From Swiss-Prot:
It is found in: Cytoplasm. SMART domains: DHDPS (SM01130). The lineage of its organism: Bacteria, Bacillati, Bacillota, Bacilli, Bacillales. GO terms for cellular component: cytosol. Pyruvate binds at T46, V205. Keywords: Amino-acid biosynthesis, Cytoplasm, Diaminopimelate biosynthesis, Lyase, Lysine biosynthesis, Schiff base. GO terms for molecular function: 4-hydroxy-tetrahydrodipicolinate synthase activity. It comes from Bacillus subtilis (strain 168). It catalyses: L-aspartate 4-semialdehyde + pyruvate = (2S,4S)-4-hydroxy-2,3,4,5-tetrahydrodipicolinate + H2O + H(+). This is 4-hydroxy-tetrahydrodipicolinate synthase. Catalyzes the condensation of (S)-aspartate-beta-semialdehyde [(S)-ASA] and pyruvate to 4-hydroxy-tetrahydrodipicolinate (HTPA). Its EC number is 4.3.3.7.
Length: 290
């Protein structure tokens, strides 16, 4: 499954009462697809999945599939720390017509490597969809060891990719070196996109692509075409906004950044809160320099 170079971890728009706003979602999807997005992740971390109900997630999957209409792959965030619930949601996502699912490592209950292997194996066995693993130990505590990722890629045909947000380039290099060529490793950290490309990564599952998708595409294309100095210049240009988007809990900064760009996507749900005025001014200043 080709997810492209830049997959956007899409925010979930809300109205002024905090309900999912599908009209805003339609506008957002069109905007992203015109600005460098090769595929969309729906109801992931940036989509505020912890505060979305199961019914809301299914509605988001269905609506996004309909709105995208085959233009790019749609990847549904169906992972959780409850294997049975993840299987149920994955089946609903498949019924909705998504192209793949993303499964985060189980959080809070701190499973062993064998527990994580069996968790992912059980979910993958219940779907024909391609599976992208998601390793983000900064959020989940549990980190998927490279050996476990390699084992999953070898043993389970529909485990086809991983979003790696561990920040461990040595581990990421090992995964790339010891998995099949058609197993794709994506950076889960915008700021590490270029370093991960340099060790053989495929691209990025991005937050910054909401704001700088075209530039990120150009950076990756320059790198793959051997124009590494030009790629480095774009990386240096984008690094301040990549950092600014994570100075406050994600996705409050990126939602504010979209609003500053004239795209109303609403606020965040509690326990997240909007940016302070100082945070907003800092973000606005950084965006204006892009």
């Amino acid at each position: 499954m080709n997810f492209g170079n830049v997959s956007t971890a899409m925010i979930t728009p809300f109205d002024n009462k905090g309900n999912v706003d599908f009209q805003k979602l339609s506008t957002l999807i069109d905007y992203l697809l015109k600005n460098g997005t090769d595929s969309l992740v729906v109801a992931g971390t940036t989509g505020e999945s912890p505060t979305l109900s199961t019914e809301e997630k299914i509605a988001l999957f269905e609506y996004t599939v309909k709105e995208v209409n085959g233009r790019v792959p749609v990847i549904a965030g169906t992972g959780s720390n409850n294997t049975k619930d993840s299987i149920k949601l994955t089946k609903k996502a498949e019924e909705a017509g998504v192209d793949a699912v993303m499964l985060v490592t189980p959080y809070y209950n701190k499973p062993s490597q064998e527990g994580m292997y069996q968790h992912f194996k059980a979910i993958a066995a219940e779907t024909s969809l391609p599976v992208m693993l998601y390793n983000v130990p900064g959020r989940t505590v549990a980190s998927l060891a490279p050996e476990t990722t390699i084992r999953l890629a070898a043993d389970i045909p529909n485990v086809v990719a991983i979003k790696e947000a561990s920040g461990d380039l040595e581990a990421i290099t090992k995964i790339i070196a010891e998995t099949p060529e058609d197993f794709y490793v994506y950076s889960g950290d915008d700021a590490l996109t270029l370093p991960i490309l340099s060790v053989g990564g495929r691209g990025v599952v991005s937050v910054a692509s909401h704001i700088a998708g075209t530039d990120m595409q150009q950076m990756i294309k320059n790198y793959t075409n051997g124009q590494t100095a030009n790629a480095a210049l774009i990386h240096q240009k984008l690094l301040p906004i990549m950092k600014e988007l994570f100075k406050a809990p994600n996705p409050a900064p990126v939602k504010t950044a979209l609003q500053l760009r004239g795209l109303d996507v609403g606020s965040v749900r509690l326990p997240l809160v909007p940016l302070t005025e100082d945070e907003r001014l800092s973000l606005s200043s950084t965006i204006s320099e892009l």
